[in-house]
């Protein structure tokens, strides 16, 4: 799902939606959009910056997946992902929400593939850190990795094992996880790359300024 919202009037000017059966929607009517999603028996709703932008304007009935927050976690290494620049989707067509839906779907498929390429330990670490964060929970539910019986102590042991030669063995990981699980996840994603020129995107540092400090503490 994608919306075009006026910068001055903050009103919805256009809505685009793409279902997994290939059907598309392109109108400015929320009522018609909801009917379109209901007809497709949609359980999960995906978008780029969906949770803190589109979802504020749309009355969405489903589990939300936001490709924006997943991208720096799963593509932390330069040149990052070709569909993303800063916090925006790269699109051939300006102000076309259906085209943006197609790009978000392509990005989601790549994010799922990248997730599946992570080691089992990394998937478990990110799940334990992020499963209660609204920006990540929908994706983790979709890929079926929600944990129910793990603790912060367990995730600390997993982190020390997975990043054994990359982080300080005496770092207070439980404290970092308690302070900002998202910040810790982004810091670990960057530490796990072998490209020291890779940097955390500016929008991540704006929303999670603790990431740089966490990297300093861990390394």
Label the model's feature ranges.
Residues 12-15, 45, 51, 63-65, ...:
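Weak global preference for isoleucine
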């Amino acid at each position: 799902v994608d919306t075009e919202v006026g910068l001055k009037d903050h009103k919805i000017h256009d809505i685009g939606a793409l279902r997994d059966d290939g059907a598309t929607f392109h109108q400015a009517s929320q009522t018609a959009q909801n009917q379109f999603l209901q007809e497709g028996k949609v359980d999960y709703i995906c978008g780029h910056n969906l949770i803190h932008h589109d979802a504020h304007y749309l009355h969405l009935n489903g589990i939300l997946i936001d490709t924006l927050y997943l991208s720096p976690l799963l593509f932390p290494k330069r040149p990052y992902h070709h569909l993303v620049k800063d916090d925006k989707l790269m699109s051939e067509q300006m102000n076309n929400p259906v085209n943006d839906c197609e790009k978000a779907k392509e990005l989601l498929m790549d994010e799922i593939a990248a997730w599946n390429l992570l080691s089992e330990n990394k998937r478990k670490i990110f799940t334990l850190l992020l499963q209660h964060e609204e920006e990540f929970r929908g994706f983790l539910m979709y890929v079926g990795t929600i944990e129910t019986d793990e603790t912060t102590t367990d995730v600390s042991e997993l982190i020390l094992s997975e990043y054994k030669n990359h982080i300080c063995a005496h770092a207070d990981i439980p404290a970092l996880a308690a302070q900002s699980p998202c910040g810790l996840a982004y810091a670990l994603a960057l530490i796990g790359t072998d490209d020291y020129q890779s940097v955390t995107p500016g929008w991540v540092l704006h929303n999670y300024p603790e990431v740089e400090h966490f990297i300093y503490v861990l390394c």
